[in-house]
């Protein structure tokens, strides 16, 4: 496992330490899930250049590291590659006894990966099942640890909601420094340029400006164009002084950038857990 180091400075009297992983992409299926998902599991594992067993072991190793080193464990989503009972059961069993936070990823709700337009209606086909296997609230959750308010929330389809903004305002009133934990990173100029150079078709970021997404194809433009509720959430976060940092995933490449909001806000994007990446984060 390749573990990088990252530090957020928020003015704490004592350090808070955690292990961040993201995009583990478990690819398990058995007879309960059916022949189609068994075939999907094999094909998807091969797409990540590993066997299903190797992907499982990389996830298990990250959780074991957090337990052994008494670190809070943070996942910013895509623990699963697709919805299956085998994936859900392995994830729950592996996380048993681990102190963890979680922001869901888009693959947490993916039934067959790429077979349909994914939106809120699509998500609701599997949301209740998926939520039942994880302790944190996957829509919006918040937990204060060592004087830091870790806010974990769903932006898996590049959007935020009015409900999440309402909850965010409530958390801001508590007066603790906030670390926002999401699956899809916020737009930041250097990250945008890096992702466009790496992928070539789009940057896979939340709330990228119109002029930055105009070059996307029709599917990606529709998928990643920010709606009014998303822009309202980002505007609040940008102006809220308690927001001190952002931790995200989704891009499969480790990257650190700074959001040039009304103040500088650091953002860490984790490397892919399916490739054995993790980050030990110190908040002081």
Model-derived regions, located:
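His/acidic metal-ligating clusters that form di-metal
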Residues: 59-72, 149, 158-258
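Short, solvent-exposed beta-strand-terminating loops
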Residues: 13-37, 109, 181-204
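Extended active-site neighborhood of metal-dependent phosphoesterases/phosphodiesterases
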Residues: 6-10, 84-179, 197, 202-207, ...
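Residue-level marker for buried hydrophobic side chains located in beta-strands
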Residues: 18-20, 73-75, 102-103, 180, ...
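Short active-site segment of divalent metal-dependent hydrolases/proteases
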Residues: 26, 80-81, 108, 149, ...
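N-terminal active-site segment of His-dependent metallophosphoesterases
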Residues: 1-87
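Charged, glycine/proline-rich intrinsically disordered loops and linkers
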Residues: 33-50, 119-127, 196-224
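Active-site glycine-centered loops adjacent to acidic/histidine catalytic or metal-binding residues
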Residues: 23, 77-78, 105-106, 183, ...
């Amino acid at each position: 496992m390749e573990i990088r180091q990252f530090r957020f400075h928020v003015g704490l009297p004592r350090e808070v330490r955690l292990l961040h992983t993201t995009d583990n992409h478990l690819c398990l299926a058995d007879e309960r899930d059916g022949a189609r998902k068994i075939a999907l599991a094999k094909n998807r594992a091969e797409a990540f250049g590993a066997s299903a067993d190797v992907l499982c072991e990389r996830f298990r190793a990250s959780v074991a590291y957090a337990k052994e080193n008494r670190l809070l464990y943070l996942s910013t989503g895509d623990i699963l590659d697709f919805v299956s009972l085998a994936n859900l059961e392995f994830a729950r069993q592996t996380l048993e006894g681990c102190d963890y936070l979680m922001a869901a990823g888009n693959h947490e709700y993916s039934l067959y990966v790429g077979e349909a337009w994914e939106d809120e209606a699509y998500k609701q086909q599997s949301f209740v099942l998926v939520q039942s296997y994880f302790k944190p609230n996957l829509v919006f959750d918040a937990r204060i640890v060592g004087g830091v308010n870790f806010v974990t929330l769903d932006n898996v389809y590049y959007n935020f909601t009015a409900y999440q903004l309402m909850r965010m305002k409530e958390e801001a009133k508590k007066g603790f420094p906030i670390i926002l934990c999401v699956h899809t990173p916020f737009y930041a100029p250097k990250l945008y340029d890096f992702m466009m150079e790496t992928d070539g078709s789009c940057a896979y970021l939340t709330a990228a400006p119109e002029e930055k997404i105009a070059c996307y194809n029709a599917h990606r433009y529709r998928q990643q164009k920010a709606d009014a509720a998303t822009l309202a959430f980002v505007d609040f976060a940008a102006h809220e002084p308690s927001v001190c940092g952002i931790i995200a995933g989704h891009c499969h490449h480790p990257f650190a950038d700074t959001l040039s909001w009304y103040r500088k806000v650091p953002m860490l994007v984790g490397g892919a857990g399916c490739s054995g990446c993790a980050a030990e984060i110190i908040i002081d």
